[in-house]
Swiss-Prot record:
GO terms for cellular component: axonemal A tubule inner sheath; sperm flagellum. InterPro entries: SPMIP11. It comes from the Eukaryota. Microtubule inner protein (MIP) part of the dynein-decorated doublet microtubules (DMTs) in flagellum axoneme. May serve to reinforce and thus stabilize the microtubule structure in the sperm flagella. Its main location: cytoplasm. GO terms for biological process: flagellated sperm motility. It is found in: Cytoplasm, Cytoskeleton, Flagellum axoneme. The gene is Spmip11. This is Sperm microtubule inner protein 11. The keyword Ion transport does not apply. Disulfide bonds: none annotated. The lineage of its organism: Eukaryota, Metazoa, Chordata, Craniata, Vertebrata. Microtubule inner protein component of sperm flagellar doublet microtubules.
Amino acid sequence: MAFFNLYLLGYQHYFQSKKRNTAQETNQKDEVPTRLPPIISEDGNYSVHQNSHERYQEAVRKVLLKTFPNQVFRVPVTDAQNFSFWRSNIPGVRPEKAIPWIKTPHHCLIKSPMTRFVDHSHLNDKTFSLY
């Protein structure tokens, strides 16, 4: 922020300011709780593991936990994350079906320039090898 002549503002929390706020704020003050609150993670993965370490390990192994940046942050933090913000959160839907413009037709070359070079060199010299 020095280029705006703003100094001594402390550290800027760029990632923290972009993160989704999962905690719900209440204005009313609750009474003092008589028991401990249930252990529920703030990232929304509780329904997957339900406080079971074995289920958590299985979810990590099968990649069932929230891992995409669009599930953690409100806006893309870096330019590399722009693609994941276009993705659909519906499980089982391929990106080509949800976003048809990312699929383009393939126009392959049957005889590429390298293939033509190798064929021509092999016809002229039977001992020709690329290696």
